[in-house]
Protein backbone atom coordinates (compact mmCIF):
# COMPACT_ATOMS: atom_id res chain seq x y z
CA UNK A 1 0.00 0.00 0.00
CA UNK A 2 2.18 2.80 -1.29
CA UNK A 3 -0.35 5.54 -0.46
CA UNK A 4 -0.26 4.84 3.29
CA UNK A 5 2.07 7.06 5.28
CA UNK A 6 4.41 5.26 7.68
CA UNK A 7 4.86 6.20 11.30
CA UNK A 8 7.41 8.95 11.80
CA UNK A 9 10.03 8.95 14.54
CA UNK A 10 8.48 10.09 17.82
CA UNK A 11 4.93 9.62 16.55
CA UNK A 12 2.89 7.81 19.19
CA UNK A 13 0.02 6.68 16.95
CA UNK A 14 0.10 5.30 13.44
CA UNK A 15 -1.38 7.26 10.54
CA UNK A 16 -4.74 5.47 10.69
CA UNK A 17 -5.41 6.37 14.31
CA UNK A 18 -3.69 9.75 14.54
CA UNK A 19 -6.78 11.87 13.84
CA UNK A 20 -8.89 9.79 16.23
CA UNK A 21 -6.34 10.27 19.02
CA UNK A 22 -6.08 13.98 18.22
CA UNK A 23 -9.86 14.36 18.34
CA UNK A 24 -9.92 12.75 21.78
CA UNK A 25 -7.14 15.01 23.10
CA UNK A 26 -8.91 18.10 21.74
CA UNK A 27 -12.14 16.79 23.31
CA UNK A 28 -10.49 16.48 26.70
CA UNK A 29 -9.03 20.00 26.39
CA UNK A 30 -12.47 21.31 25.40
CA UNK A 31 -14.08 19.65 28.42
CA UNK A 32 -11.59 21.32 30.75
CA UNK A 33 -12.20 24.76 29.21
CA UNK A 34 -15.99 24.21 29.39
CA UNK A 35 -15.96 23.71 33.17
CA UNK A 36 -16.75 27.38 33.98
CA UNK A 37 -19.82 26.90 31.68
CA UNK A 38 -19.71 30.47 30.26
CA UNK A 39 -16.63 29.47 28.26
CA UNK A 40 -18.43 26.57 26.51
CA UNK A 41 -19.18 28.34 23.18
CA UNK A 42 -15.61 29.62 22.88
CA UNK A 43 -14.23 26.19 23.80
CA UNK A 44 -16.34 24.37 21.21
CA UNK A 45 -15.70 27.01 18.56
CA UNK A 46 -11.95 26.71 19.10
CA UNK A 47 -12.15 22.90 18.88
CA UNK A 48 -13.98 23.19 15.56
CA UNK A 49 -11.36 25.64 14.26
CA UNK A 50 -8.51 23.32 15.26
CA UNK A 51 -10.20 20.30 13.67
CA UNK A 52 -10.93 22.29 10.50
CA UNK A 53 -7.17 22.75 10.22
CA UNK A 54 -6.72 18.99 9.77
CA UNK A 55 -7.96 19.38 6.20
CA UNK A 56 -5.30 22.03 5.62
CA UNK A 57 -2.43 19.94 7.02
CA UNK A 58 -2.24 21.93 10.24
CA UNK A 59 -1.54 20.03 13.47
CA UNK A 60 -4.56 18.92 15.50
CA UNK A 61 -3.15 18.96 19.00
CA UNK A 62 -4.17 20.14 22.45
CA UNK A 63 -1.21 22.56 22.33
CA UNK A 64 -2.55 24.22 19.19
CA UNK A 65 -6.00 24.27 20.77
CA UNK A 66 -4.81 26.19 23.84
CA UNK A 67 -2.68 28.54 21.71
CA UNK A 68 -5.68 29.41 19.53
CA UNK A 69 -7.91 29.78 22.58
CA UNK A 70 -5.47 32.26 24.17
CA UNK A 71 -5.47 34.34 20.98
CA UNK A 72 -9.24 34.54 20.65
CA UNK A 73 -10.71 34.84 24.17
CA UNK A 74 -12.59 38.14 24.42
CA UNK A 75 -15.63 39.67 26.11
CA UNK A 76 -17.90 38.57 23.25
CA UNK A 77 -17.07 34.93 24.00
CA UNK A 78 -18.17 35.32 27.61
CA UNK A 79 -21.36 37.10 26.52
CA UNK A 80 -22.11 34.21 24.13
CA UNK A 81 -21.53 31.80 27.00
CA UNK A 82 -23.81 33.77 29.32
CA UNK A 83 -26.57 33.79 26.68
CA UNK A 84 -26.20 30.01 26.15
CA UNK A 85 -26.28 29.37 29.90
CA UNK A 86 -29.36 31.59 30.31
CA UNK A 87 -31.08 29.65 27.51
CA UNK A 88 -30.33 26.33 29.21
CA UNK A 89 -31.64 27.60 32.55
CA UNK A 90 -34.79 28.94 30.90
CA UNK A 91 -35.37 25.60 29.19
CA UNK A 92 -34.88 23.73 32.48
CA UNK A 93 -37.32 26.09 34.22
CA UNK A 94 -39.88 25.57 31.44
CA UNK A 95 -39.62 21.80 31.79
CA UNK A 96 -39.96 22.07 35.56
CA UNK A 97 -43.12 24.13 35.13
CA UNK A 98 -44.47 21.63 32.62
CA UNK A 99 -43.79 18.81 35.07
CA UNK A 100 -45.69 20.61 37.82
CA UNK A 101 -49.01 19.47 36.36
CA UNK A 102 -50.17 22.75 34.85
CA UNK A 103 -53.00 22.58 32.28
CA UNK A 104 -51.63 22.03 28.77
CA UNK A 105 -48.29 20.89 30.15
CA UNK A 106 -47.80 18.24 27.45
CA UNK A 107 -48.24 20.71 24.59
CA UNK A 108 -46.11 23.26 26.40
CA UNK A 109 -43.30 20.74 27.00
CA UNK A 110 -43.37 19.60 23.35
CA UNK A 111 -43.26 23.22 22.12
CA UNK A 112 -40.42 24.09 24.49
CA UNK A 113 -38.47 21.00 23.36
CA UNK A 114 -38.92 21.92 19.67
CA UNK A 115 -37.79 25.51 20.28
CA UNK A 116 -34.81 24.28 22.31
CA UNK A 117 -33.82 21.82 19.57
CA UNK A 118 -33.90 24.56 16.93
CA UNK A 119 -31.92 26.93 19.17
CA UNK A 120 -29.36 24.19 19.90
CA UNK A 121 -28.89 23.44 16.20
CA UNK A 122 -28.31 27.13 15.39
CA UNK A 123 -25.97 27.58 18.38
CA UNK A 124 -23.92 24.49 17.57
CA UNK A 125 -23.72 25.31 13.88
CA UNK A 126 -22.58 28.82 14.88
CA UNK A 127 -19.73 27.28 16.90
CA UNK A 128 -18.58 25.41 13.78
CA UNK A 129 -18.58 28.55 11.61
CA UNK A 130 -15.17 30.21 11.04
CA UNK A 131 -16.80 33.58 11.83
CA UNK A 132 -17.28 32.49 15.45
CA UNK A 133 -13.59 33.11 16.08
CA UNK A 134 -14.10 36.86 15.65
CA UNK A 135 -17.82 37.72 15.37
CA UNK A 136 -20.55 35.71 17.10
CA UNK A 137 -23.39 37.73 15.56
CA UNK A 138 -22.25 36.95 12.03
CA UNK A 139 -21.72 33.30 12.98
CA UNK A 140 -25.24 32.99 14.41
CA UNK A 141 -26.74 34.76 11.39
CA UNK A 142 -25.01 32.41 8.95
CA UNK A 143 -25.77 29.37 11.13
CA UNK A 144 -29.49 30.24 11.19
CA UNK A 145 -29.45 30.55 7.40
CA UNK A 146 -27.63 27.21 7.07
CA UNK A 147 -29.96 25.49 9.55
CA UNK A 148 -33.00 26.37 7.44
CA UNK A 149 -31.39 25.73 4.05
CA UNK A 150 -29.59 22.52 5.04
CA UNK A 151 -32.17 20.47 6.93
CA UNK A 152 -30.12 17.28 6.47
CA UNK A 153 -27.12 18.91 8.11
CA UNK A 154 -29.29 20.13 10.98
CA UNK A 155 -30.52 16.57 11.45
CA UNK A 156 -26.91 15.38 11.55
CA UNK A 157 -26.16 17.97 14.25
CA UNK A 158 -29.06 16.70 16.39
CA UNK A 159 -27.93 13.12 15.81
CA UNK A 160 -24.37 14.02 16.89
CA UNK A 161 -25.67 15.67 20.07
CA UNK A 162 -27.89 12.68 20.84
CA UNK A 163 -24.96 10.29 20.29
CA UNK A 164 -22.65 12.35 22.54
CA UNK A 165 -25.33 12.51 25.25
CA UNK A 166 -25.98 8.76 25.01
CA UNK A 167 -22.28 7.94 25.26
CA UNK A 168 -21.92 10.21 28.30
CA UNK A 169 -25.01 8.66 29.91
CA UNK A 170 -23.82 5.09 29.30
CA UNK A 171 -20.32 5.66 30.66
CA UNK A 172 -19.70 8.86 32.62
CA UNK A 173 -15.95 9.17 31.85
CA UNK A 174 -16.87 9.43 28.14
CA UNK A 175 -18.51 12.77 28.94
CA UNK A 176 -15.02 14.28 29.14
CA UNK A 177 -14.11 12.98 25.68
CA UNK A 178 -17.48 13.63 23.96
CA UNK A 179 -16.79 17.27 22.96
CA UNK A 180 -14.04 16.13 20.57
CA UNK A 181 -16.20 13.86 18.38
CA UNK A 182 -19.05 16.39 18.67
CA UNK A 183 -16.77 19.17 17.41
CA UNK A 184 -15.58 16.89 14.60
CA UNK A 185 -19.19 16.21 13.59
CA UNK A 186 -20.08 19.93 13.67
CA UNK A 187 -17.02 20.78 11.59
CA UNK A 188 -17.82 18.05 9.08
CA UNK A 189 -21.39 19.34 8.69
CA UNK A 190 -20.13 22.89 8.12
CA UNK A 191 -17.43 21.79 5.65
CA UNK A 192 -20.06 19.71 3.82
CA UNK A 193 -22.32 22.77 3.60
CA UNK A 194 -19.44 25.00 2.46
CA UNK A 195 -18.55 22.53 -0.29
CA UNK A 196 -22.16 22.39 -1.47
CA UNK A 197 -22.63 26.19 -1.51
CA UNK A 198 -19.41 28.04 -2.41
CA UNK A 199 -19.09 31.30 -0.50
Question: Which residues does each PLM region occupy?
Answer:
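Helix-coil boundary and N-terminal low-complexity module in membrane systems
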Residues: 1-110, 119-199
